[in-house]
Amino acid sequence: MQHGGPALDGSRMTQEQIVQLLPTREGHFIFESGHHGQFWLDLERLFLHPERVRPLAEELAGRLRDHQIEAICGPLIEGAFVGLMVASALRLPFSYSAPVRDDRATGLFPISYPIPEALRSELRGKRVAVVNDIINAGSAVRGTLASLKRCGAQPVVIGTLAVYGDAACELATTHDVALETLASFASRIWEPSVCPLCAKGVPLHA
């Protein structure tokens, strides 16, 4: 689940396709990363009609082709679905990472994204694209990048249908990888201690 706001750039048609697939709700929300924000997308609805996502996944595959990647890795849940479509379009091996919550964690990013042990040897030494559905705070991509490096893979590019805010660019810079996205939207997230919605007393959505 993620969130978004007004469109900034990219193909207008692609922007509109994504907005139609994932209408935005406004309110006060807490996200997987632990950040707070004002907009929410029900990502569970993204693959309600897979045929609507496939052209976007194929467009993303075309952008990733030039990065000489040898495998695709997508974080469960919806990111892995996009990754599987991209891997199929490029005829590349596909792997995934799965969310695991650390109940002892008290700060941001309490969820890690390990790669199943049976898949790690298939990724070792390979140039890998991390493919996701939507990136906002970047919890899933952040965790997947860390897991790929631990198993000896070489992440070279992040691919996503859309980014919300600046976190995706910051992740790409931090990990020295490229970023390919079909659309970009304005969005702001806050740590709980500085959330202006909390300061105004706006209740969190359940």
Residue map of PLM features:
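A generic structural signal for well-ordered alpha-helical segments
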Residues: 64, 86-87, 148, 172
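PRPP-dependent phosphoribosyltransferase catalytic core
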Residues: 2-21, 145-206
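Short, glycine/charge-rich flexible loops or terminal/linker lids adjacent to PRPP-binding catalytic cores
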Residues: 83-129, 136-142, 197
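Short, well-ordered alpha-helical microsegments
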Residues: 79-83, 165-168
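Active-site-facing substrate-recognition patch
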Residues: 2-68, 206
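Conserved acidic residues
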Residues: 70, 126, 156
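Glycine/small-residue-rich loop that forms an oxyanion/phosphate-binding "nest" at active or ligand-binding sites
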Residues: 64, 78, 96-97
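Short glycine-rich phosphate-binding loop at a beta-alpha junction
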Residues: 69-76, 159
